[in-house]
Amino acid sequence: MKKLVILGSTGSIGKSTLSVVEQNKTEYEVFGLVGGKNVELMAAQCLLFQPKFAALDDENAAKALEEQLRQLNVKTEVLSGQKAICELSAHPEVDMVMAAIVGAAGLLPTLSAVKAGKKVLLANKESLVTCGQIFIDEARKSGAQLLPVDSEHNAIFQSLPPEAQQKVGFCPLAELGVSKIILTGSGGPFRVKPLDEFAAITPAQAVAHPNWSMGKKISVDSATMMNKGLEYIEARWLFNASAEEMEIIIHPQSIIHSMVRYIDGSVIAQMGNPDMCTPIAHTMAYPKRINAGVAPLDFFKLKELTFIEPDFARYPNLKLAIDAFAEGQYATTAMNAANEVAVEAFLNERIRFIDIVNVNRTVVENIAPVQVKEIADVLHIDKLARELAEQAVINL
């Protein structure tokens, strides 16, 4: 049995991961669960999966969890704080770590798993957006296996030759006959909405994604296509791709999850129903296959598959992300932090939908260029960018 730690078990990806475990109980043992403050859900997960450890970032929440588990007679040991979570990620008994904590909070525990040479199922975008070079270098040093969980990157991974799959982060695409990585995106819920109506978009409208079931933050990112911008940055790092080797296409049906174009004219695509359990199951079992509990794709129900070029006037956040990568790691780190603040402000109705990109752009343009050499640099830039973003929100 493979022993698994889930960083972010109470979130959307974490819950989907546990549902895949339920489908394959003889293959996987949940060794540790990590969450933020959701005591009720964590207690329910501990009751169901009986992990050896459960960790919450918040100390008071951890104490409340300990009390609940005692009443439920669950023997799971409760930990709290970043240090304990990092130690759990690197625990010698652990085979694989699902890195699904949203935001900068997931950086250190994910890096801890990478340094320990674990099989790391990477669902935390920020790891590569803010620390791409650091993560790739550490994985090469430790021998950690990085497997992308994001549906698009997982699709690209599956469409690449086996040699490239063994060299995530440093695969020579051109040598393997790859000409383009084609990243697809649905275009979100406002793909055909008139631009003059964007100022009136509400949080409720923005979180209603047409195809995927996701958390609020990532749903807003999908609506602005910042999500695709972050995925562009991730793909550049994961697949060692140049700007010329990248292509972004809007595919509203979300059936083709991404593609790889080869120099002989072939295009290999990965398809399936839009359900995160598929890429989760793929990374958990790789190089084998397991049941993900996902309905098979019914080709006879597909009316059409359409492809559209992205419009940067409609999706300025996408252009901002592409340009930020060209600027360097400091710019992508600052943009990511600013976006977290801006999206939170929008969800709390402090700013309009169209102001999200204005906050992000203000921060990227005003942050001082810094060379990112270690994670302390990343955390410093992240902190500065959040302060700048908060000020930008107030100034709007």
From Swiss-Prot:
Enzyme Commission code(s) on record: 1.1.1.267
Cofactor entry: Mg(2+); Mn(2+)
GO MF assignments: 1-deoxy-D-xylulose-5-phosphate reductoisomerase activity; manganese ion binding; NADPH binding
Reaction(s) catalysed (UniProt annotation): 2-C-methyl-D-erythritol 4-phosphate + NADP(+) = 1-deoxy-D-xylulose 5-phosphate + NADPH + H(+)
InterPro entries: DXP_reductoisomerase, DXP_reductoisomerase_C, DXP_reductoisomerase_N, DXPR_C, DXPR_C_sf, NAD(P)-bd_dom_sf
Cystine connections: none
Positions bound to 1-deoxy-D-xylulose 5-phosphate: 125, 151-152, 186, 209, 222, 227-228, 231
GO biological process per UniProt: isopentenyl diphosphate biosynthetic process, methylerythritol 4-phosphate pathway involved in terpenoid biosynthetic process
Pathway(s) per entry: Isoprenoid biosynthesis; isopentenyl diphosphate biosynthesis via DXP pathway; isopentenyl diphosphate from 1-deoxy-D-xylulose 5-phosphate: step 1/6
A Pfam family annotated for this UniProt entry: DXP_reductoisom
Keyword RNA-binding applies: no
Binding site for Mn(2+): 150, 152, 231
Binding-site positions, NADPH: 10-13, 36-38, 124, 126, 215
Keywords: Isoprene biosynthesis, Manganese, Metal-binding, NADP, Oxidoreductase
Purpose: Catalyzes the NADPH-dependent rearrangement and reduction of 1-deoxy-D-xylulose-5-phosphate (DXP) to 2-C-methyl-D-erythritol 4-phosphate (MEP).
Family membership: Belongs to the DXR family.
UniProt-listed NCBIfam families: Dxr, PRK05447.1-1, PRK12464.1
Protein name in UniProt: 1-deoxy-D-xylulose 5-phosphate reductoisomerase
Protein's organism: Actinobacillus pleuropneumoniae serotype 3 (strain JL03)
